[in-house]
Amino acid sequence: MNKRTIAAVVATTTAAALVTSACSQTPSATPAATAKVCAATSDAHPDPATDPVATALAGAADRASIAYESASGEGAPASLVASGCTLIVGTDSTMASSISETARANSAVRFALVGASFTDAKGARVSLKNGSIVDVDASQAAYLAGYASAGMTTTGTLAVIGGTADNVTSSQMDAFAQGVDSYNLANGTSISVLGWNNVTNQGTFADSAEQVQSLAADFISQGADIIVPLAGENNVGAARAVTAAANPLVRLVWSGLTKADLKGLTRDEAESTDEVMSGQSGAQSGAPAAQQVDTQSFADAFSYIQIADDVRAEIGAPVLTGIVVDYSAAMDTLIAEATAGSPASTVPVSLASGGVILTGFGAYTPMLSSELKLGLSDMAGQIETGGLVISTPFDV
């Protein structure tokens, strides 16, 4: 089994180190007829169709009737400039160095980085007038998923598996572990997480579906009954491992979902679902005896949004809940700002913006205790309003 446990690269420079590049200027407006938006993907996504940001950018370009192109690898930003791109988006933090270098040298072209900041030649964070940032708070949903999983486990062991060791992936792994720690603190439990150490900021990553499957099988053998694969298209390996385990208690928290993978419930349907909840949970939940409570806030937060039936069927393994990170609105904003000649900005993808979602629990909803449901609802509301801030070493 080819495993690799690596330390994710953490940008530790403080916000005080941000400086403005004197030679940069805000690029002028670019009419849609002459604009060209482009995705610069890492070598981890040589096929742009497997990169969620590139896919979202292509869709936004189509909606705006603007030309689109993509390229992968460290040389992608420079080649896209030569190709006449007027907006170039680096799709993950591993592209930060090459995007930053190219942006500094081409002030008339707009750039954007997803989940990372621009840097100067020495690697210090820098603010560029032609550089926007997409600030991805996928960690918010991952934190909630960690808390929920801790309340649903029957073995007391959970696991996470990363794919590309970029900031967005690492932040989700860290936040999931934080959510578990929060549950332990609140309930006096000692539920553990395999695959991530939020003291050392090290985790277990995999390059292929086969590696994900091998890691998932290993974690299942160590007692993990809820596994979170954060490996993009390679998540399928975790589904295969769960299916092969043939253990009905082993479930997945699925990732890589967009809004196109969801279905919505009406308020009446959500309330009907709430009425049949048993108030029972897994052995580790520490929940009180079943009781009838007002779960409308929980319904508002989670029950209206579910993973679509056909998506669950395609996954082919039991899915407890899902983490949605949808970049569509953020890409629309980047294109609108570029064509209008607006100043560079920071574009949020978060619970509050609607770009980050923890889905409902489907058939597992009756197994959530009233205490767990209301706790999740309360935390989600606090996160959206800023009362609870989920921070990781990998934040922009």
Model-flagged regions — what are they?
Residues 19-22:
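C-terminal motif of bacterial Sec signal peptides marking the signal peptidase cleavage site
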Residues 24-396:
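A residue-level marker of the well-folded mature domains of exported/periplasmic proteins
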